[in-house]
């Protein structure tokens, strides 16, 4: 049985190494992608944390829908205040509560000074050195400066506008907003913080004074959407913040820098809670932050974004870090259209992190965002990372987050100068963090030094006459000798041609799936992965192996690396430009990729130092040719083989080792069946001399053994593989393995993690109106990137692998073309809203999504039966989707109608308004009041220029109420129910018009979002009940129900 050298470049070894590398990388990657690290068995393993308590809190928090505009939201808020108090009581912490402008000190531990006094402190009666007086002064200071202050914030408001909305293209008019916040802020005093109520000094907007070393804030919003229970969006974040309060109020964990837990309300409707916080005095204290969010419904919590590398190093302390800077680049480049509170704090100048759940998106904002569909492991993953991050930030008492800002922006927090960073995890265990300018230096060095080094090595090879790449034919020294081909151009262009053809076919297949069954990736991303990767692999092998079979070349691997280097260099140029100009860090993939390819290419070129000089090879080839000619002449003239036998014997006596087969061929006596040319093996030199060859004979060097008679160290003959160039027999047989290890494992880990991350984030975004082709293109690109490392070696793989992958391609292609894309585990999201004209009593239910599936869903709804379903696009609200409407069951959001009477009879009372025009001016005053709501909107058909809410807080200078282009909406959010709004509105004077000559028209709208009680919004109940099990119904706009009346002024 023949044994193969495991390091030899032969099919069996290459196939085995390929299988080991790819399985060894992708099995762990898939496990990490689809699983979450287990929570500890002991729920109190970490001092100050209680995982069981956190899980019970999550179940309590997510037992109902609690959007801002719901009564349940008030219940959750009251529950949070109660839970904070219970945690502080449990830890025996002295704390105070501040509500509005009044301060209510509530000492929660025993106030008996003597009971608190340690035994080592002398009592006042027996001490004459003043220590007792100092002791009581300390106690009084501690009583005046409690360890914790809870702010029941009922006064922070926000007033501003937004020029764009999520999913809106080309919108130029603003949406003005007035929001009254009701956040909860818990401040845990740090050991380095100032004593007393320092937040009451100075003006609210003052940024000049720094208290202590600056504070560390954790933010989570406690409101949910109206169609989701908010377990991960953002219940896990809320209970994590509660546990952090518990942790930092444990005596062993008192922070050095102050810790702030912000429970903000109103994030889902426009990040309003975070914006309102900025007008609170505690906002002056925060320097760094950790924002906790949920854009999925479980799994691992990933590091979405970070402001700089310094603050990211705090997250690196997490036991199971997870994330890549590529996700941050997605926001920076505008590919991700949704936002979190992170963007508010970053704009304020804070330095911090955005950690969020990100999959599965099919459960995001649905009724499956509950405790049942998440896990205690996911909770622990976010909680443990948050503890590690905040603990590191609160211990950093140096100048990292202090001092003048790097951007010199006036009015921002003076929290030092941060540097753009690059970060990524490896197998969810190791977290790499470095500065973007370091990556830029690597990129620039690689762009300049790598080509120079390759040219230098090539030059040295050429000087030594050993550079076989691009070598053609060389003429021997004899005047009548024919040129001898080196075969250096063989296989030079097959790699780029194959790559172009294979990539085109792969992208074409992605377009085919997008054309026929575009949503299959929604539920079957791994089927799409398998199809794309198996297609690329099998086609690439077929072309390259076929070329190698027809025209073998020992340079094929080297040329492949050269072309990869050229392509990678071009891509790296673009990545370097983005690093420098746009601060995009995701190019680290290509830096690592190109560095590995460069080293592999260097080996491919450098291994030619082991080859003979080209001139020597040509000379030996000519001698071999002459020797064969001598043998031919002897055979023709009938010369016996005595002389040849004598030479063979002499050779054996000198210790030369010969192959037995060669002896047989050399000693055979020619006869009429002997071939006319080449009496011996084609690769062996004949030892038979000829009588008539003396005039043509050249001097034979002592070292000459023929062009193919190369020997290893043991004296065994080495032959070129599979008909490749004769000189290739002297190439090292092990260098391919080093090259594979360079371009294989680490590159596959880094690229594979990013590819899996991006596809998991994108494959269920089609229902949001995102481009349907995008996830298929991402899969195709990363399939190619992940398989490029094997392509230089692919012609040496056995046929078994491409055969298997071709069968995989056929099976997955058929499945992807014909399978239904949704299931109960991967439900299609249909967006719901009901609008009611309170003047006429007409109501309309609108279901939004991809028209093909929306019509199928509506067909299941009884009240829509027999109606003509009208579908149209509305890019002002959500682009890329169809809005299909029908007349639905009347809502009962206001309980003012007796059973048996049509609810339309009570519509008039749901919303009342009065508008008064100011004479001779383009001004009007609106009085608006809605029942069972705290959210109303003024929508204008034409823009206005200014507005003012009576009784509202002073407008923050950081925001404009109305943009220069004007606004056409005013959103009004109140912290109180059934509030009457008084709003002054002014609009610009038109051309050739005088003040007072122009009016305005529009609608007064109020919103209702509470769907906790069945029957309040029966159209929504009906849609949920009768829609197919592969569908979920989620909210479209701020209100599930909009009631409106027309106004003319």
UniProtKB/Swiss-Prot annotation:
Its Gene Ontology molecular function terms?
metal ion binding; metalloexopeptidase activity
Q: Which Pfam families does the record associate with it? A: Peptidase_M28 (PF04389), PFF1_C (PF22250), PFF1_TM (PF22251)
Question: Where does this chain mainly localize?
Answer: membrane
Glycosylated residues (UniProt): 50, 157, 914
Cofactor binding, note field: Binds 2 Zn(2+) ions per subunit.
User: What EC numbers are recorded for this enzyme?
Assistant: 3.4.-.-
Q: Where is this site: Transition state stabilizer?
A: 364
- What membrane topology is annotated for this entry? Multi-pass membrane protein
Record GO cellular component, one term: vacuolar membrane
- Could you list which ranges are Vacuolar topological domains? 33-438, 517-526, 579-585, 762-773, 823-1049
Which positions in this protein are listed as binding Zn(2+) 1? 221, 233, 293
Q: Mind listing the UniProt keywords for this protein, alphabetically?
A: Glycoprotein, Hydrolase, Membrane, Metal-binding, Metalloprotease, Protease, Transmembrane, Transmembrane helix, Vacuole, Zinc
Q: Name one GO biological process term.
A: proteolysis
Determine the domain of life of the protein's source. Answer: Eukaryota
Where does the protein end up? Vacuole membrane
Q: Active site at which residues?
A: 267 (proton acceptor)
Q: Does the keyword Transmembrane apply?
A: yes
Membrane-spanning residues? 12-32, 439-459, 496-516, 527-547, 558-578, 586-606, 741-761, 774-794, 802-822
Quote the record's binding site residues for Zn(2+) 2: 233, 268, 365
Q: Which cofactor does this sequence's record say it needs?
A: Zn(2+)
Family annotation (InterPro entries): Fxna-like_M28_dom, M28_fam, Peptidase_M28, PFF1_C, PFF1_TM
Q: What does this protein do?
A: May be involved in vacuolar sorting and osmoregulation.
- Annotated protein name in UniProt: Vacuolar membrane protease
What is the protein's species of origin?
Answer: Botryotinia fuckeliana (strain B05.10) (Noble rot fungus)
Its ancestry begins with: Eukaryota, Fungi, Dikarya, Ascomycota, Pezizomycotina
């Amino acid at each position: 049985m023949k044994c193969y050298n495991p390091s030899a470049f032969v099919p069996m070894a290459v196939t085995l190494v390929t299988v080991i590398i790819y399985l060894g990388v992708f099995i762990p990657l898939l496990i990490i992608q689809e699983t979450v690290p287990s929570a500890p068995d002991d729920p109190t393993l970490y001092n100050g944390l209680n995982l069981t308590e956190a899980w019970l809190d999550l179940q309590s928090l997510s037992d109902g829908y609690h959007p801002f505009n719901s009564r349940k939201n008030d219940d959750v808020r009251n529950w949070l205040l109660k839970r904070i108090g219970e945690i502080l009581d449990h830890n025996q912490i002295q704390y105070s509560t501040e509500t509005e402008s009044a301060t209510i000190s509530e000492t929660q531990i025993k106030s008996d000074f003597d009971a608190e006094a340690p035994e080592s402190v002398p009592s006042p009666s027996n001490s004459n050195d003043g220590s007792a007086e100092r002791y009581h002064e300390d106690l009084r200071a501690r009583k005046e400066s409690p360890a914790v202050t809870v702010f029941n914030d009922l006064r922070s408001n926000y007033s501003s506008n937004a020029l764009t909305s999520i999913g809106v293209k080309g919108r130029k008019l603003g949406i003005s907003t007035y929001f009254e916040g009701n956040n909860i802020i818990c401040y845990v005093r740090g050991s380095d913080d100032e004593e007393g109520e320092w937040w009451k000094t100075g003006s609210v907007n003052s940024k000049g004074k720094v208290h202590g070393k600056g504070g560390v804030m954790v933010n989570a919003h406690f409101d949910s959407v109206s169609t989701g229970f908010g377990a991960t969006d953002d219940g896990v974040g809320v209970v994590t913040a509660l546990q952090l309060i518990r942790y930092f109020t444990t005596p062993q964990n008192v922070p050095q820098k102050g810790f702030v837990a912000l429970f903000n309300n109103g994030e889902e409707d426009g990040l309003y809670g975070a914006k309102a916080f900025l007008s609170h005095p505690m906002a002056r204290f925060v320097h760094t932050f950790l924002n906790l969010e949920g854009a999925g419904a479980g799994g691992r919590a990933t590091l979405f974004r970070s402001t700089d590398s310094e603050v990211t190093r705090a997250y690196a302390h997490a036991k199971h870090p997870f994330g890549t800077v590529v996700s941050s680049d997605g926001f920076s480049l505008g590919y991700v259209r949704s936002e979190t509170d992170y963007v508010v704090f970053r704009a304020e100048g804070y330095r911090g992190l955005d950690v969020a759940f990100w999959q599965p998106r099919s459960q995001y904002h649905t009724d499956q965002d509950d405790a049942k569909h998440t896990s205690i492991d996911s909770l622990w993953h976010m909680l443990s990372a948050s503890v590690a991050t905040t603990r590191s930030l609160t211990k950093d008492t140096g100048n990292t987050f202090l001092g003048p800002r790097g951007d010199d922006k006036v009015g921002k927090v003076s929290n030092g100068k941060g540097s753009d960073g690059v970060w990524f995890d490896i197998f969810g265990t190791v977290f790499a963090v470095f500065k973007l300018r370091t990556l830029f230096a690597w990129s620039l060095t690689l762009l300049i030094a790598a080509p120079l080094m390759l040219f230098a090595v090539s030059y040295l090879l050429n000087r030594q006459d050993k550079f076989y790449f691009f070598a053609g034919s060389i003429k021997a020294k004899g005047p009548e000798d024919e040129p001898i081909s080196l075969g250096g151009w063989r296989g030079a262009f097959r790699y780029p041609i194959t790559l172009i053809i294979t990539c085109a076919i792969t992208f074409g297949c992605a377009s085919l799936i997008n054309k026929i069954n575009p949503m299959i990736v929604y539920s079957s991303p791994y089927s799409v992965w398998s199809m794309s990767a198996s297609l690329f692999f099998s086609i690439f092998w077929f072309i390259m192996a076929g070329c190698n079979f027809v025209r073998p070349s020992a340079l094929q691997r080297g040329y492949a690396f050269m072309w990869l280097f050229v392509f990678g260099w071009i891509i790296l140029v673009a990545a370097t430009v983005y690093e420098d100009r746009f601060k995009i860090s995701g190019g680290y993939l290509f830096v690592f990729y190109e560095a590995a390819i460069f080293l592999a290419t260097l080996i491919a070129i450098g291994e030619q130092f082991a080859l003979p000089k080209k001139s020597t090879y040509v000379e030996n080839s000519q001698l071999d040719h002459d020797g064969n000619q001598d043998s031919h002449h002897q055979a023709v003239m009938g010369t016996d083989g005595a002389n040849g036998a004598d030479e063979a014997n002499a050779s054996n006596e000198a210790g030369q080792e010969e192959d037995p087969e060669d002896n047989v061929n050399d000693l055979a006596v020619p006869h009429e069946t002997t071939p006319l040319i080449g009496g011996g093996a084609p690769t062996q030199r004949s030892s038979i001399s000829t009588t008539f060859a003396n005039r043509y004979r050249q001097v034979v060097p002592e070292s000459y053994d023929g062009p193919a008679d190369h020997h290893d160290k043991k004296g065994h003959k080495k032959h070129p593989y599979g008909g490749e160039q004769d000189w290739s027999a002297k190439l090292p047989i092990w260098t391919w393995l080093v090259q594979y290890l360079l371009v294989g494992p680490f590159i596959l880990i880094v690229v594979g993690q990013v590819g899996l991350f991006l596809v998991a984030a994108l494959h269920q975004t089609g229902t949001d109106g995102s481009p349907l082709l995008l996830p298929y293109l991402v899969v195709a690109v990363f399939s190619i990137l992940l398989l490029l490392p094997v392509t230089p070696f692919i012609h040496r793989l056995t046929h078994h692998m491409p055969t298997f992958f071709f069968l995989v391609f056929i099976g997955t292609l058929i499945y992807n073309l014909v399978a239904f894309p949704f299931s109960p585990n991967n439900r299609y999201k249909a967006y719901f809203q009901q609008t009611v004209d309170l003047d006429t009593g007409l109501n309309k239910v609108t279901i939004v999504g991809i028209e093909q599936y929306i019509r199928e869903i509506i067909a299941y709804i009884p009240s829509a039966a027999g109606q003509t379903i009208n579908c149209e696009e509305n890019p002002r609200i959500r682009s890329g989707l169809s809005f299909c409407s029908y007349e639905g069951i009347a809502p009962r959001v206001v309980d003012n109608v007796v059973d048996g009477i049509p609810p339309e009879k009570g519509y008039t009372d749901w919303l009342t308004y009065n508008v008064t025009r100011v004479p001779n001016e383009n001004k009007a005053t609106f009085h608006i009041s809605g029942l069972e709501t705290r959210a109303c909107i003024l929508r204008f058909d034409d823009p206005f220029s200014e507005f003012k809410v009576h009784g509202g807080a002073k407008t923050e200078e950081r925001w404009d109420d109305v943009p220069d282009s004007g606004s056409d909406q005013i959103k009004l959010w109140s912290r109180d129910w059934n509030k009457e709004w008084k709003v002054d509105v002014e609009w610009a004077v038109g051309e050739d018009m005088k003040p007072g000559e122009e009016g305005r028209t529009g609608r007064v709208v109020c919103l209702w979002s509470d769907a906790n009680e069945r029957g309040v919004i029966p159209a929504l109940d009906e849609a949920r009940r009768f829609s197919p099990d592969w569908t979920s119904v989620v909210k479209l706009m701020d209100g599930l129900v909009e009631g409106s009346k027309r106004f003319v002024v």
